[in-house]
C-alpha cells in the first residue's frame, strides 16, 4: 500500500463523514399521545369536565382538602401537577398548610372523559422545595418550563400574595427538596417587575442564531398588574435569566430588544405550549376576569391571535359549591388555566382554579376544575 493509497482512503473516509446527515436537535414527543376524549365541540365552545382537586374532590384522601393552580410537569417516569397554597381542610386556612405540593397523576386518567385522577402526593409530609419558606410568607409555583422532560419551575416568594423574589428550581420526580438553580434568584422588581410569573416551551427547530432551537417564554407580573411579554433563549442558557432575549413589536424591534407587551390586557396566570406546531397560550385575563386561550402560528403572533373564552366570570350561586350544567361555562372567581397533556387543537383541556373569597364563605370552595375548549385558530 502506497502513501498515495492511504491519502485517497483518508479522503474517501472524510467525504463519507461530511455526507452524513447533521445531528438535529429534537424535542421529546408528547406523552400521552394527544387525542380527544369528548364528542367534538363546536368551534369556540367550551365544556366543563368537572372538579379534579381541592374542595369536594378525592384529593382529600391524600391530605389535600383544598388547593389551586395544579400546573402539569411531565417526566419519563410519570406526570405531576404542581399546586399552590394547599390545606388539609376543605378551605383556605383550614388545617395544616403546604406550599407548593405535587399531585401524582394517574396516567390512565389523563385521557379519561370523566377527568384526571391521582394516586399520591409529594410535599405534605416533607417540603417539596429545598429552600425553607421565609416567616409569614409563601413559596408559590409561578410557571413551569420543560426542556426534553427536564423540568424547571419558577418559584415566587410572596407575602399576602405580593411578590418579593423569584427563582428557578430543578424538579425531581416523586421526591421533595427540589434544589434552587444557582444564581437564578431575582428581586420582584427584576425586568421591570414583569418576570415574576412565566411559562414556556422548547421548540427544537434550528435557526442561524441557535442550531439547537429556542425556548420561548411568556412572562408577566405575579400580581396580575401587567400585560404579557415574550422572551427566547437557547436551551443551553435557559437557567441564566440574564441571557433571555426580549421581543419588541415596535418598529425596528424584533429579538434581543427590550420586550414590549404582546397586547394591552393585564394578565395573570399563564400556560403556553406548542401543539401541532402552533403556539397555544391559556391565561387569566385580569382586565375582564375571564379565562381565555389564544392559538398562533408562532409566539410573536400571540398578540394578534383571536381569543377564545374558556370560562366567563360570574357571581357566586347561593350554594357556592354548586356548578351549572357542563355546557354552561360560567364560573365565579376563576383563575389559573393550565393546559393538560393530551390536548389537541380541537380539544384543548384546561385546568381552572376557583376560590371563594367572600367574607361569609369561609374561603371555600378552593379547587381546580377541568374544562375542554375548541379554540379559534389562525
Model-predicted regions and their roles:
Residues 68-71, 126-145, 196-206, 268-271, ...:
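Beta-propeller and closely related beta-sheet repeat lectin domains
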Residues 1-28:
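Secretory targeting and sorting signals
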Residues 349:
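Substrate-binding cleft of secreted/luminal carbohydrate-active enzymes
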Residues 304-305, 333-337:
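Catalytic cores of extracellular degradative/oxidative enzymes
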Residues 30-62, 74-135, 146-194, 210-265, ...:
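Beta-rich carbohydrate-recognition and catalytic domains
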Residues 15-16, 22-24, 69, 141, ...:
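A generic alpha-helix preference that emphasizes hydrophobic side chains
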Amino acid at each position: 500500500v502506497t502513501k498515495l493509497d492511504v491519502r485517497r482512503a483518508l479522503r474517501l473516509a472524510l467525504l463519507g463523514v461530511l455526507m452524513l446527515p447533521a445531528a438535529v436537535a429534537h424535542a421529546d414527543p408528547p406523552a400521552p399521545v394527544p387525542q380527544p376524549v369528548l364528542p367534538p365541540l363546536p368551534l369556540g365552545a367550551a365544556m366543563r369536565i368537572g372538579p379534579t382537586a381541592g374542595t369536594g374532590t378525592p384529593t382529600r384522601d391524600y391530605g389535600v382538602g383544598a388547593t389551586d393552580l395544579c400546573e402539569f410537569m411531565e417526566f419519563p417516569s410519570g406526570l405531576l401537577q404542581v399546586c399552590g397554597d394547599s390545606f388539609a381542610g376543605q378551605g383556605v386556612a383550614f388545617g395544616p398548610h403546604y406550599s407548593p405540593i405535587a399531585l401524582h397523576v394517574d396516567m390512565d386518567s389523563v385521557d379519561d372523559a370523566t377527568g384526571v385522577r391521582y394516586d399520591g402526593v409529594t410535599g405534605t409530609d416533607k417540603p417539596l422545595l429545598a429552600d425553607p419558606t421565609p416567616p409569614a410568607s409563601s413559596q408559590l409555583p409561578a410557571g413551569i418550563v420543560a426542556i426534553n422532560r427536564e423540568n424547571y419551575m419558577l418559584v415566587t416568594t410572596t407575602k399576602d400574595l405580593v411578590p418579593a423574589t423569584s427563582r428557578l428550581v430543578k424538579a425531581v420526580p416523586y421526591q421533595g427538596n427540589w434544589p434552587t438553580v444557582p444564581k437564578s434568584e431575582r428581586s420582584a422588581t427584576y425586568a421591570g417587575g414583569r418576570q415574576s410569573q412565566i411559562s414556556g416551551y422548547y421548540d427544537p427547530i434550528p435557526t442561524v442564531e441557535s442550531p439547537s432551537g429556542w425556548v420561548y417564554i411568556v412572562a408577566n407580573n405575579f400580581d396580575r398588574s401587567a400585560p404579557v411579554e415574550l422572551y427566547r433563549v437557547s436551551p443551553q442558557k435557559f437557567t441564566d435569566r440574564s441571557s433571555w432575549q426580549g421581543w419588541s413589536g415596535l418598529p425596528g424591534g424584533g429579538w434581543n430588544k427590550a420586550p414590549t407587551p404582546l397586547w394591552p390586557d393585564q394578565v395573570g396566570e399563564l400556560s403556553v405550549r406548542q401543539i401541532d406546531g402552533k403556539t397555544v397560550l391559556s391565561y387569566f385575563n385580569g382586565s375582564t376576569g375571564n379565562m381565555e386561550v389564544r392559538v398562533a402560528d408562532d409566539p410573536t403572533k400571540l398578540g394578534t391571535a383571536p381569543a377564545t373564552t374558556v370560562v366567563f366570570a360570574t357571581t357566586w350561586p347561593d350554594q357556592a359549591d354548586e356548578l351549572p350544567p357542563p355546557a354552561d361555562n360560567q364560573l365565579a372567581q376563576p383563575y389559573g388555566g393550565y393546559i393538560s397533556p393530551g390536548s389537541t387543537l380541537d380539544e384543548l383541556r384546561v385546568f381552572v382554579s376557583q376560590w371563594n373569597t367572600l367574607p361569609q364563605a369561609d374561603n371555600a370552595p378552593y379547587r381546580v376544575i377541568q374544562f375542554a375548549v375548541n379554540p379559534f385558530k389562525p
